[in-house]
């Protein structure tokens, strides 16, 4: 959208004082004016000059269309664009990154052909009775409901959140599951937690807090775990520096007799890398056991993570706890266990292709989490192409999610691990309430 069409969205009276050298363009999404400096005598910066202002024509930058550049200066801009510098820096770093290998965790399966909406809807209608038949034959036992709570998280985290505790409740349950499953650090058992799709590193931060506080409450010295944080993005307000600050604060509160210079800080390593390209073995310290964790690892990222763990040093992999989400964002070509789905189809619908059935599963999986407007009854159809009431669509959505998740569970079971799907939080806390718990057999 051109600047001239957006200037009108600026609230009345929201123009900058002429004495302030800031662009007068209002950014509706950020609810503030642009912070760039305009040229002398101009009201807007070069990025937000109206198209009819008589200034040189501007075009989106080919490297990053989020910003524009004067058309006449495009060639010189490409040489100095920040995106060019970032790409060059990343390429230079990769030459010294033994943990990077392009596509190492991708599946060898060819990509599924794209389906138009009519084809996809027809596949869904065909898949509905197949899914119901599979669920009746294969998934009659409900998943174990285990909504747990960690005392240390409640002690430290909950007082900071007087109102919205949804994320804290999920973190508390996941952390307690790690403890009860034996996937926990101790002074005599150092481990490294690898958080996939870590974002700001929030889950790892509270694992660190809970582990250190538990050790201090027992009167023993604190031995924080190590952390490896993996994400392809570089979010703002990361928690990386908070790990050491939390350890120091907990010592000061609960064990002040330990001198500050003797309070161990956790080793925290962050890598900006796509899980698709991650060679995990090159990131881990030799001889140190590791545990994979993630909260709401989205769609295909879960499948890439499972393959990454399977290809990594399994001798040191104690287990994993992954809260999954967004099955509608999966990919039939990248799914971790296509053989599992193909075997189900061979028994229940041998004439249906894997790719089309999986695309239908993705579509139906979204029905479980799309939510309802307040007051919508279970019997509401609302013109949906399936002709099914909303309650029935939600039920089928949960069955589709279950099938996708069962294949992931079986993937690790086939590798010799104890693997379980469980409900780790209440549905009104999060609709994405299923976690995959993997443990090395005793």
UniProtKB/Swiss-Prot annotation:
Q: Which reaction does it catalyse?
A: cytidine(4) in tRNA(Pro) + S-adenosyl-L-methionine = 2'-O-methylcytidine(4) in tRNA(Pro) + S-adenosyl-L-homocysteine + H(+); cytidine(4) in tRNA(Gly)(GCC) + S-adenosyl-L-methionine = 2'-O-methylcytidine(4) in tRNA(Gly)(GCC) + S-adenosyl-L-homocysteine + H(+); adenosine(4) in tRNA(His) + S-adenosyl-L-methionine = 2'-O-methyladenosine(4) in tRNA(His) + S-adenosyl-L-homocysteine + H(+)
Region: Disordered; residue ranges are 1-21
Q: Which PROSITE patterns match?
A: ZF_CHHC_U11_48K
Under InterPro entries, the record lists:
Methyltransferase_TRM13, Trm13, TRM13/UPF0224_CHHC_Znf_dom, Znf_CCCH-type_TRM13
Localization recorded for this chain is:
Cytoplasm; Nucleus, Nucleolus
List the Pfam families hit by this protein, alphabetically: TRM13, zf-TRM13_CCCH, zf-U11-48K
GO CC, one annotated term? cytoplasm
Gene Ontology MF terms in the entry: tRNA 2'-O-methyltransferase activity; tRNA methyltransferase activity; zinc ion binding
- Major subcellular location class: cytoplasm
Q: Which residues form the signal peptide?
A: none
> Coiled coil where?
none
Keywords, A to Z?
Cytoplasm, Metal-binding, Methyltransferase, Nucleus, S-adenosyl-L-methionine, Transferase, tRNA processing, Zinc, Zinc-finger
Q: Name one GO biological process term.
A: tRNA methylation
Q: What EC number(s) would the UniProt record show?
A: 2.1.1.225
Q: Binding positions for Zn(2+)?
A: 61, 67, 77, 81
| Zinc finger intervals, CHHC U11-48K-type | 58-85
> Which purpose does this protein serve, as stated in its record?
tRNA methylase which 2'-O-methylates cytidine(4) in tRNA(Pro) and tRNA(Gly)(GCC), and adenosine(4) in tRNA(His).
Q: PANTHER family from the xrefs?
A: TRNA:M(4)X MODIFICATION ENZYME TRM13 HOMOLOG (PTHR12998:SF0)
Family recorded in the similarity comment:
Belongs to the methyltransferase TRM13 family.
Q: What is this protein called?
A: tRNA:m(4)X modification enzyme TRM13
Lineage start? Eukaryota, Fungi, Dikarya, Ascomycota, Saccharomycotina
């Amino acid at each position: 959208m051109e600047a001239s069409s957006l200037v009108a969205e600026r609230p009345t009276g929201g123009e900058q004082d002429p004495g302030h050298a800031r662009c007068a363009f209002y950014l509706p999404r950020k609810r503030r004016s642009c912070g760039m400096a305009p040229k002398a005598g101009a009201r807007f910066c070069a990025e937000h000059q109206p198209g009819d202002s008589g200034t040189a024509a501007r075009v989106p930058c080919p490297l990053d269309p989020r910003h524009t550049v004067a058309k006449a200066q495009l060639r010189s801009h490409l040489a100095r664009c920040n995106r060019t510098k970032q790409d060059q820096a990343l390429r230079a770093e990769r030459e010294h990154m033994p943990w990077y290998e392009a596509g190492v965790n991708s599946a060898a399966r060819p990509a599924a052909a794209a389906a138009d909406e009519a084809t996809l809807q027809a596949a869904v209608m065909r898949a509905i009775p197949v899914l119901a038949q599979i669920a009746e034959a294969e998934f009659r036992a409900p998943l174990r409901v285990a909504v747990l709570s960690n005392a240390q998280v409640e002690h430290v985290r909950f007082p900071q959140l007087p109102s919205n505790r949804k994320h804290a409740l999920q973190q508390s349950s996941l952390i307690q599951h790690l403890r009860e499953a034996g996937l926990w650090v101790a002074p005599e058992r150092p481990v490294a937690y690898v958080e996939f799709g870590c974002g700001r590193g929030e889950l790892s931060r509270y694992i660190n807090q809970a582990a250190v506080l538990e050790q201090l409450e027992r009167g023993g010295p604190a031995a924080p775990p190590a952390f490896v944080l993996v994400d392809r993005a570089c979010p703002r307000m990361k928690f990386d520096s908070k790990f050491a600050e939390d350890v120091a604060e907990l010592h000061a509160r609960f064990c002040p007799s330990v001198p500050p210079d003797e309070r161990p800080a956790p080793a925290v390593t962050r890598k900006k890398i796509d899980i698709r390209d991650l060679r995990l073995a090159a990131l881990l310290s030799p001889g140190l056991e590791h545990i994979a964790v993630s909260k709401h690892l989205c769609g295909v990222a879960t499948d890439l993570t499972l393959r990454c763990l399977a290809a990594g040093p399994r001798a040191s992999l104690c287990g994993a706890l992954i809260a999954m989400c967004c099955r509608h964002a999966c990919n039939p070509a990248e799914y971790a266990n296509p053989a599992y789905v193909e075997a189900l189809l061979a028994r229940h619908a041998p004439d249906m292709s894997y790719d089309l059935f999986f695309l239908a599963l993705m579509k139906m999986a979204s029905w479980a989490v799309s939510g309802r407007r307040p007051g919508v009854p279970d019997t509401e159809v609302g013109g949906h192409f399936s002709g099914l009431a909303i309650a029935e669509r939600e039920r089928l959505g949960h069955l589709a999610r279950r099938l996708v998740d069962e294949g992931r569970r079986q993937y690790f079971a086939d590798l010799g691990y104890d693997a379980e799907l469980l409900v780790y939080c209440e549905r009104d806390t999060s609709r994405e309430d299923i976690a995959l718990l993997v443990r090395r057999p005793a």
